[in-house]
Amino acid sequence: MRILGIETSCDETGIAVYDDEKGLLSHELYSQVKLHADYGGVVPELASRDHVRKIIPLIEKAMEDANTQPSDIDGVAFTQGPGLVGALLVGSSVGRSLAYAWNVPAVGVHHMEGHLLAPMLEDDAPAFPFIALLVSGGHSMLVKVEGIGQYEVLGESIDDAAGEAFDKTAKLLGLDYPGGPLLAKLAEKGEAGHYKFPRPMTDRPGLDFSFSGLKTFAANTIRDADLTGDNAEQIKANIAYAFQEAVVDTLIIKCKRALKQTGMKRLVIAGGVSANTMLRSEMKALMQALKGEVFYPSLAYCTDNGAMIAYAGMQRLKAGETLALSSQAKPRWPLDTLSAI
């Protein structure tokens, strides 16, 4: 079975062709970072228009790179939600149109299920069951995963997601958009011990997250810091280090609780923030101490991409799941409402 995958939930246009025997045949990704940089964040209308401009050329390139003709495609998978409604409509409209034109089934994929299954693209894919930490700009959640579609959300952010807190704190530090990776890079120059940030919601039971207070603490710390002297950049680096350390520690504490609560020994980290070097290092140390295993997608598949959508869509198409061509995009779509396969 060979699947065309389409991802347009936010500001990346991702296209991939995946074959169940040969694996990933092609992977194209266009990021709109430069388009939105002047605005300091994603502008939904601009994102939708740029998807319209890029999606067909990227599909043609992915098909060419995969040496694949329309007659070779057995199904089309596209991100149906959650995400920006206009951006989702671009991918879903093109995906459904191609499925109709090629006379193949279409399937709508949950964006976070795509992230959750992204490590399955690797040679050392995790076996079920496992705990998944999904951390991105729009989501932070801990999920108990028994199988595809068998998801129990153990905890999630009650306000800002971890990635959103990274980006907003980076902006307060005067870093460009998207700020998360730039903050992490700045933190590499930081020194421990100069600032102590709180670890939100770790002083009480439960697995939910809250990062808005941490962002406010960072704003107050930056406001009170002397950033006019010769060592201003070092002070910023120290603040970045302390902020990142607080986020990572919080995620570590919550993951440790989830593993203890469920008795599981396998942990999957996925989503854009899973590319963070400190997070990967600390999670590896945690799982070694617990005599467990931790799994990540390759860096190319941490951010939004078509490969994860193609893979997730293939699993559902194989199970006989298809989508009516009249189906709508789902900007809001709880992960634990998906059907098990």
Curated annotation (Swiss-Prot):
Q: Where does Fe cation bind?
A: H111, H115, D304
GO terms (molecular function) for this protein are: iron ion binding; N(6)-L-threonylcarbamoyladenine synthase activity
Q: What are its E.C. numbers? A: 2.3.1.234
Question: Which BP terms does GO give this entry?
Answer: tRNA threonylcarbamoyladenosine modification
Metal-binding among keywords: yes
- Kindly state which keywords UniProt assigns to this record, in alphabetical order: Acyltransferase, Cytoplasm, Iron, Metal-binding, Transferase, tRNA processing
Q: Which InterPro entries match?
A: ATPase_NBD (IPR043129), Gcp-like_dom (IPR000905), KAE1/TsaD (IPR017861), Peptidase_M22_CS (IPR017860), TsaD (IPR022450)
Question: What HAMAP family does its record include?
Answer: TsaD
What's the name of the protein?
tRNA N6-adenosine threonylcarbamoyltransferase
Organism annotation: Alteromonas mediterranea (strain DSM 17117 / CIP 110805 / LMG 28347 / Deep ecotype)
